[in-house]
Swiss-Prot record:
Pathway: Amino-acid biosynthesis; L-tryptophan biosynthesis; L-tryptophan from chorismate: step 5/5. It comes from Alcanivorax borkumensis (strain ATCC 700651 / DSM 11573 / NCIMB 13689 / SK2). Gene3D superfamilies: Aldolase class I (3.20.20.70). Belongs to the TrpA family. The active site is at E49 (proton acceptor), D60 (proton acceptor). It catalyses: (1S,2R)-1-C-(indol-3-yl)glycerol 3-phosphate + L-serine = D-glyceraldehyde 3-phosphate + L-tryptophan + H2O. InterPro entries: Aldolase_TIM (IPR013785), RibuloseP-bd_barrel (IPR011060), Trp_synthase_alpha_AS (IPR018204), Trp_synthase_suA (IPR002028). This is Tryptophan synthase alpha chain. Keywords: Amino-acid biosynthesis, Aromatic amino acid biosynthesis, Lyase, Tryptophan biosynthesis.
Length: 267
């Protein structure tokens, strides 16, 4: 059984939901990322989504775009990100790590060499935001052969037929984007999310993580009542931005938010 599936199975047995933080690798500097990953696990994270910096992150709002810029100022490459995961794995073999980013850096490395390097580093899944399932036919078998789950996005506007397709094409979990627009936008309508999650459950057999619009313990708790996982990104990346000149403060700032979310989700 793969690490992501095992994680959701364990949480299900404990009647708990997955807390899934997102941070951009190499933001604000490369040395911050691995200690931050450990700090997030200590604060209650179950799965880590690690952003691979890209020069044109079109699905992301200004907060995460700036995070990519900060990481790229230090030339954080895809291989650097894989090296970070490898170091993390030296002392943590349990927490799943998902690389989230865009197709271009994967194509540049080549599907096979990327998948092999990701497997060797201890990566568990890949979420490429600009790769729809219809276009993933070539990539999927390569990732699968190296034990990597392919995670796809479901939007509020996604049709039932397409949700079924995504459920069949993906593995690990589905990422439901709870708001129209870019990351870090607008406020969350939990009733709307609950209704959509129910629809998705009837069409796809994978656990459902919900992201976009989760900013605090209250919204994390509300979403955890209806989804299998809560994805939080911009709220954490904001803290990293605020502490970019004092990197030593980042672990506590991010950990504080996650601890509060974990506590609220477990109540």
């Amino acid at each position: 059984m793969r690490r992501i599936e095992r994680c959701f199975q364990r949480l299900d047995g404990e009647n708990r939901k997955a807390l899934i933080p997102f941070v951009t690798a190499g933001d604000p500097v490369k040395d911050v990322t691995v200690p931050l990953m450990h700090a997030m696990v200590d604060a209650g994270a179950d799965i880590i989504e690690l952003g691979v910096p890209f020069s044109d992150p079109m699905a992301d709002g200004p907060v995460i775009q700036l995070a990519c810029e900060r990481a790229l100022q230090h030339n954080t490459s895809t291989r650097d990100v894989l090296a970070m995961v490898k170091i993390f794995r030296e002392t943590n073999t349990q927490t799943p790590v998902v690389l989230m980013g865009y197709l271009n850096p994967v194509e540049v490395m080549g599907y096979e060499s990327f998948a092999k390097a990701a497997e060797d580093a201890g990566v568990d899944g890949v979420l490429l935001v600009d790769l729809p399932p219809e276009e993933a036919l070539e990539v999927r078998p390569v990732m699968d052969a190296h034990g990597l789950d392919m995670i796809f996005l479901v939007a509020p506007t996604t049709s039932d037929t397409r949700i079924k397709l995504i459920g069949e094409a993906g593995s690990g979990y589905l990422y439901y984007v709870s708001l129209k627009g870019v990351t870090g936008s607008a406020t969350l309508n939990v009733e709307e999310v609950a209704s959509r999650v129910e629809t998705i459950r009837n069409l796809a057999q994978l656990p459902i993580g919900v992201g976009f619009g989760i900013k605090d313990a209250e919204s994390a708790q509300a979403v955890s009542r209806v989804a299998d996982g809560v994805v939080v990104g911009s709220a954490l990346v904001n803290q990293i931005a605020e502490n970019k000149n004092t990197p030593d403060a980042i672990n506590d700032a991010v950990g504080g938010i996650l601890s509060a979310m974990r506590k609220a989700m477990d109540q």
